[in-house]
């Protein structure tokens, strides 16, 4: 039995939003996530009572909420349920799916795949002295995660200033953190007036569901209210079907199941679909979300699709599904506008980082530096520069060294924005302006 309850039918009828929970290690992402699930009634009471007793016995009572997530991770690793990849909770208005649960080995890589599907991000920062500072420092993940969230198109951002109990609910500390983060957010072009900064304690439950009496100085929304007030992003239902594959499973008695989020268009039971780059064709047998069978899935839905004609070994994460009469675009070359976030020296032609685009990762070479742009205006300041460096914005021509599906950012942002990573850091982020398509033969 899973520690997490499955959503009810009425919950699944609410509009769906994907929530990425981001922030520096040890700032309390897991504890806050566990607390959110508990407060919204999505944790099995009996299983949680066992965790509580265990935590008490070990003198680690404060760990019980984070342990909800650990237990879930164990369930996943044992392969308990296929849809355990999507854990959710509901507010009066929405059903939220928490994507990319905290605590994976290569967190930033997973964060990119997860955030590329997110409608909103919850940034968790610790108020504990030293912890906040290391998160926004040069090696800190707070800054990097925020940059990635912006680049990946997440405009709905909520900041939870966590561990307020550790600083005795000090308003000055909260204001200081809010001030420093606001500076970073302004540089990234977030509208700071639209970003709620909520002082919380995940361990004590302050300002999660009900207003805390420990912080009478705070007059804003509690966390669940702020989540409920998110503006849903537009769903490109009228565009061609594009579904980047997150995972491929082979299920005994059922066949091949692909999971992922429909980024555009609609897919119905009985449709003939194609997965590219491998150019495999199949028919949709059934569609499921959170244990519920659907006749169709549309942009914004997280689904598992059982496909006749697909074999597990033919497909992988990062392949993209579309309809046979309007297949996804495999790129031979890409023209993109990139912003260099971090690089120790300079970047020239021949540089080959790894591109992360939707759920795909592919080594990609810069084959031409077309121009350097003014970051503020976007105007060209130099044609054919010899090199680009940290802080520069440039138009570049890229060649993926393995086949990959992308779309122009102007056509479909979810498949048109990417980041470039190298040496474990995010070097640059960009948007795809033009594509030279590769020749692909699709055989039925």
Curated annotation (Swiss-Prot):
InterPro entries: EFTu-like_2, EFTU-type, GTP-eEF1A_C, P-loop_NTPase, Small_GTP-bd, T_Tr_GTP-bd_dom, TRAFAC_GTPase_members, Transl_B-barrel_sf. It is found in: Cytoplasm. Residues 23-30 are annotated as: G1. Keywords: Cytoplasm, Elongation factor, GTP-binding, Hydrolase, Magnesium, Metal-binding, Nucleotide-binding, Protein biosynthesis. GO terms for molecular function: GTP binding; GTPase activity; translation elongation factor activity. SUPFAM superfamilies: EF-Tu/eEF-1alpha/eIF2-gamma C-terminal domain, P-loop containing nucleoside triphosphate hydrolases, Translation proteins. The keyword Metal-binding applies. GTP binds at residues 23-30, 100-104, 162-165. It catalyses: GTP + H2O = GDP + phosphate + H(+). Residues 100-103 are annotated as: G3. Residues 14-235 form the tr-type G domain. Gene3D superfamilies: P-loop containing nucleotide triphosphate hydrolases, Translation factors. Residues 79-83 are annotated as: G2. Residues 162-165 are annotated as: G4. The keyword Oxidoreductase does not apply. Residues 201-203 are annotated as: G5. Mg(2+) binds at residue 30. GO terms for cellular component: cytoplasm. Its EC number is 3.6.5.3. GTP hydrolase that promotes the GTP-dependent binding of aminoacyl-tRNA to the A-site of ribosomes during protein biosynthesis. HAMAP family: EF_Tu_A. Belongs to the TRAFAC class translation factor GTPase superfamily. Classic translation factor GTPase family. EF-Tu/EF-1A subfamily. This is Elongation factor 1-alpha. It comes from Caldivirga maquilingensis (strain ATCC 700844 / DSM 13496 / JCM 10307 / IC-167). The gene is tuf.
């Amino acid at each position: 039995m899973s520690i997490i309850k499955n959503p009810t039918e009425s919950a699944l009828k609410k509009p769906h939003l994907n929530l990425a929970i981001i922030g520096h290690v040890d700032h309390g992402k897991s504890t806050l996530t566990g607390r959110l699930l508990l407060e919204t009634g999505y944790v099995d009471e009996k299983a949680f009572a066992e965790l509580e007793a265990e935590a008490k016995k070990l003198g680690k009572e404060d760990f019980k909420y984070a342990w909800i997530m650990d237990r879930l991770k164990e369930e996943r690793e044992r392969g308990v349920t296929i849809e355990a990849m999507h854990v959710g909770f509901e507010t009066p208005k929405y059903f939220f799916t928490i994507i990319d649960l905290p605590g994976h080995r290569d967190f930033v890589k997973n964060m990119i795949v997860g955030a590329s599907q997110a409608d909103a991000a919850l940034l968790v920062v610790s108020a504990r002295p030293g912890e906040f500072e290391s998160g926004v420092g040069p090696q800190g993940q707070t800054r990097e995660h925020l940059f990635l969230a912006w680049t990946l198109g997440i405009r709905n951002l909520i900041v939870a200033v966590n561990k307020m109990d550790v600083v005795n609910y000090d308003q000055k500390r909260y204001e200081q953190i809010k001030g420093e983060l606001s500076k970073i957010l302004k540089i990234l072009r977030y509208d700071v007036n639209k970003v709620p900064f909520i002082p919380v304690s995940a361990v004590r439950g302050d300002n999660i569901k009900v207003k805390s009496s420990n912080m009478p100085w705070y007059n804003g929304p509690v966390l669940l209210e702020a989540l409920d007030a998110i503006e849903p992003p537009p769903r490109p239902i009228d565009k061609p079907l594009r579904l980047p594959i997150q995972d491929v499973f082979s299920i005994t008695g059922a066949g091949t199941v692909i999971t992922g989020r429909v980024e555009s268009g609609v897919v119905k039971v009985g449709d003939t679909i194609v997965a590219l780059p491998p150019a495999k064709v199949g028919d949709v047998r059934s569609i499921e979300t959170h244990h519920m069978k659907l006749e169709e899935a549309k942009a914004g839905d997280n689904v598992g699709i059982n496909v006749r004609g697909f074999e597990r070994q033919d497909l992988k994460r990062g392949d993209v599904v579309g309809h046979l009469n309007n297949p996804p675009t495999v790129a031979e070359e890409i023209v993109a506008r990139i912003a260099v976030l971090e690089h120790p020296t300079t970047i020239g032609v021949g540089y080959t980082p790894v591109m992360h685009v939707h759920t795909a990762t592919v080594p990609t070479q810069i084959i031409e530096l077309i121009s350097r742009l003014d970051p503020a205006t976007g105007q060209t300041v130099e044609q054919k520069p010899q090199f680009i460096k940290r802080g520069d914005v440039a138009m570049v021509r890229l060649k993926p060294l393995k086949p990959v599906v992308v779309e122009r950012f102007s056509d479909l942002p979810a498949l048109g924005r990417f980041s470039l990573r190298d040496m474990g850091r995010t070097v640059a982020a960009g948007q795809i302006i033009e594509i030279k398509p590769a020749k692909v033969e699709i055989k039925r």
